[in-house]
Each structure stands twice: as structure tokens, then as C-alpha cells.
Amino acid sequence: MVPAIPETPVRKFNINFGPQHPAAHGVLRLVLELDGEIVERVDPHIGLLHRGTEKLMEARTYLQNIPYFDRLDYVAPMNQEHAFCLAIEKLLGVEVPIRGQIIRVLYSEIGRILNHLLNVTTQAMDVGALTPPLWGFEEREKLMVFYERACGARLHSNYFRPGGVHQDLPPELVEDIDTWAKAFPKICDDIEGLITDNRIFKQRNVDIGVVSKEEAISWGFSGVMVRGSGIAWDLRRSQPYENYNDFEFDIPLGKNGDCYDRYLCRMQEMRESTKIIRQACEMLRKTHGPVLSEDNKVAPPRRAEMKRSMEALIHHFKLYTEGFKTPAGEVYACVEAPKGEFGVFVVSDGTNKPYRCKIRAPGFPHLAAMDWMNRGHQLADVSAILGSLDIVFGEIDR
């Protein structure tokens, strides 16, 4: 008689993905529970880049707080400043001059392209294509130069101000941006030629990480994550801010809500942003005037005026030491950032500093759904799904 082999309990295999994994987008640590090659549970560990931004902001004036927003989603910095400035303008009831609005739109769209170039090409890198990131970074470098020529900094721009933007754009810069925008669709074609119909890229992304319309809404997704599932929700259209109503652009939608559709949406969004950039350059040629509000409560006096008038000098000094006071109240402002709806909820107690500032990072709910999206997928699909979520840790950990 053959002795019965004692049953050994099957132990699930646990594996750490990150924080120093090349596909883990920064400092993400995922604890994966595997059954063979199949993912059963994903446990994201966040907080490794937590800097206490929201708490720090309570001890700074409104103007001193703007640079903190560059450090959230550091791939497209100006889009975050935008939301904070809109919130302050809502509190104060300040109007932005039309030229200032156009410049804001122009640089928000440049930020969108910066973000999508990085995401689309690194998504390809996560599944094994090593050429696209090199091409993407070449274009990002040109856009970084436009950032630098507008405000002097390549990354942490600190360019938007309550009431407009810090300084006007020289005409040569507008021409150079327009020239770049004319040539950019060709670059998009090159990148698409490399990966859109690539057999391996499709096998790794089609029908992976599918999100239905209902699920996207109940998880609190925004941006490409809902548009990839076929929901036409874009704040630039549905709740227009600045002068987006004056621009003609389409909102690309996916059908299947998988990683591949989200990739296609981002590719098409870059083309739409290029259209907006061309229109903005055309508008800037025709529209002249101030780029910062004339309201002296929030905007500093002109440099020439300060050289003549003592009052203007005092005014400037007070504005930059004490800052301006906002009326007490609560306000929420949001923009369509490249990753989704970036919102800022400011509670003001009538002083020169915010009483509380809550930042709604679009990547946070996306990462929260990581566990649900990966269940039943292969281990190799984790990096493909993570790549299509478009996660940057600056804004998730804040």
C-alpha cells in the first residue's frame, strides 16, 4: 500500500515591486500577492515622497505658496499653479486680462504635451520598447526651453500669478513656439509609427486593465482614465475656465477602456493640444495689452512707476513682505491637468495666509484602484497597467 502523501498547504507568493524598480515610476512600493503568475492582491505603499505640502502652505502667504505647486506633478508644473491661482482669483473676484488668459492656456497645453510625451513613451518602455523615450525626451527638451524663455526656469517655473502671469512673452518666443507646433505632428506620426501598430505593444496593452464607464465614475477617475472608457468629460469643455471657449479642439474618446485606448487618447490629445497652441500663438499676435491684472491689491506696480513714486515702492514692499489678504470663505477651483481633474480647495480666514488648502491630486484615486484593476492579470501586466494610469508621486504623496 502506497503511503498517502501529506497535503502541504499552498502558500501564496509575495513579491515587492519597487520602490527602486525601474517601472515603478518614482518611489512606489507595491506588495503583490501571486498565485503562480496570476496577481491576486496588490497593496500600494505610498508616502515615501511625503513632504507635508498642505501643512507647509498654512504658514506661507498666498504668493509664497505658488512654487509648492510646481513640486507636485513635476512633469507638467504650470498646470498645478493654474488651479491655485484660479482659486485665489475666485476668492478675490479678480479678472485676468485676455492676453494673460491666452498665455495661461498656451502654457497649460505645453504642459499637457510635456506630460503625455513622457507618459506615452515610458509606457512603451515599461513593456520593452526602448527607442520612444529617447525621441520623447528630445521634444520635451525643446519645450523645456520654452518654459525657460518665459520665466527663467526649466522645471519649477513659478510663472502664474493671481491675476495673470508674471511677465509677457517676447514676440520671438511666440514665433518659435508656433514653428515648433507646426513640426510637432510629424514627430507624433513617428512615435505612432513605432508603437501604435506594433504587434508586441498591442499584445501587452489591448484588453489589459479594462475600466467600464460605471467603474470609472464610482472610483472617482478623471482625465484620460474616464475618456478612455468613452465618457466625454473634459473640464476645458464641461466647466470652461480662462478663454477655452474661444478655442477649437476635439476631445478624443476611447471605446474599450483598456490600456491601449488610454494610450491612443493621449496620442490624440497631443495633436489637439498642438492645435490649441497654434491658435493661441495666432491670438497673441493680434491681442496686446497687460498680462497681469491692474488690481493693485494683488499685482505689484510697474517697474517704471516704482522708480518715480515712493508710494508705489512702499506698495511693492508691503505686497511682497505681508502679501495680500483674501476675504474669509471657502472656494474650490479645478483645472483639466494632463492626468485628470486637479482641484484646490482653499479655506480662507481673512488673513494673508490660507487657513487650509486641500489638494485634489488626480493620480490618487487612480492609484487607489491599482488593486482592483490588477486582480486576475499576469504579473507582467502590472507594469503595463501602472504605465497607463500615468502616476507621478509628487502629487500623490504631496
UniProtKB/Swiss-Prot annotation:
GO cellular component, one term: plasma membrane
Assembly mode: NDH-1 is composed of 14 different subunits. Subunits NuoB, C, D, E, F, and G constitute the peripheral sector of the complex.
Record field: catalytic activity: a quinone + NADH + 5 H(+)(in) = a quinol + NAD(+) + 4 H(+)(out)
Family (UniProt): Belongs to the complex I 49 kDa subunit family.
One GO MF term attached to the UniProt entry: NADH:ubiquinone reductase (non-electrogenic) activity
Function description: NDH-1 shuttles electrons from NADH, via FMN and iron-sulfur (Fe-S) centers, to quinones in the respiratory chain. The immediate electron acceptor for the enzyme in this species is believed to be ubiquinone. Couples the redox reaction to proton translocation (for every two electrons transferred, four hydrogen ions are translocated across the cytoplasmic membrane), and thus conserves the redox energy in a proton gradient.
Signal peptide: none
Annotated coiled-coil segments of the chain: none
Protein name: NADH-quinone oxidoreductase subunit D
Location relative to the cell: Cell inner membrane
Keyword Transmembrane: no
Top-level lineage group: Bacteria
Main subcellular localisation: membrane
Membrane topology: Peripheral membrane protein
